[in-house]
């Protein structure tokens, strides 16, 4: 009789502990994405990819126009998939595309851009991922449409044909 009670008691204790932790994770806001829409763009200092000069967000986003901030990496397959759509958006006169190269090797990133072309007017280097975190990004690719220094749209994942048309409609 005692032998059967010990395993049953162990299972009950395990289930209680599991439910306690599960309930705690459900109530946690650690994994809740930040709502970045209609918020001001983050203020930051960053290195320019091509020149290694340091600049600030205030200098980059000085004009009251549309900016498309694209967080990308050469090792990111979806980034390669969305690249042709970014190249098409590059032709829009009222849009400036800013690239943030995320946790990448400079040589591989340059090869990526030489191979596919660069849609970016400026590329920023984010070696440790802190700039992406400031923007509220969790990975690559993520893209933010900015107007008047405010984030007006956040795109998680690669830009596709539907999103391309949506962006064009917004900026017209």
What is the predicted role of each segment?
Residues 1-47:
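N-terminal targeting signals for export/organelle localization
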Residues 1-7, 28-31, 58-60, 91-92, ...:
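Short, Lys/Arg-enriched, disordered terminal segments
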Residues 40, 65-67, 71-75, 139:
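Short pre-active-site segment immediately N-terminal to redox-active cysteine/selenocysteine motifs
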Residues 68-69, 97, 143:
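Hydrophobic beta-strand anchors of alpha/beta hydrolase catalytic cores
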């Amino acid at each position: 009789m005692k032998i059967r009670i010990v395993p049953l008691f162990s299972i009950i204790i395990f289930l209680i502990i599991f439910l306690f932790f599960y309930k705690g994770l459900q109530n946690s806001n650690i994994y809740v994405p930040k709502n970045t829409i209609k918020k001001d763009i983050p203020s930051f200092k960053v290195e320019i990819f091509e020149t290694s000069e340091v600049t600030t967000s205030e200098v980059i986003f000085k004009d009251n126009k549309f900016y498309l901030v694209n967080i990308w990496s050469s090792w990111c397959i979806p980034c390669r998939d969305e690249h042709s759509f970014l190249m098409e958006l590059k032709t829009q006169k009222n849009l400036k595309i800013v690239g943030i190269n995320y946790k990448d090797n400079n040589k591989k990133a340059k090869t990526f851009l030489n191979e596919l072309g660069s849609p970016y007017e400026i590329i920023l280097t984010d070696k440790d991922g802190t700039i992406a975190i400031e923007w509220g990004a969790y990975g690559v690719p993520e893209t933010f449409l900015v107007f008047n220094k405010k984030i007006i749209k956040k795109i998680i994942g690669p830009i596709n044909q539907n999103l391309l048309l949506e962006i064009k409609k917004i900026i017209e």
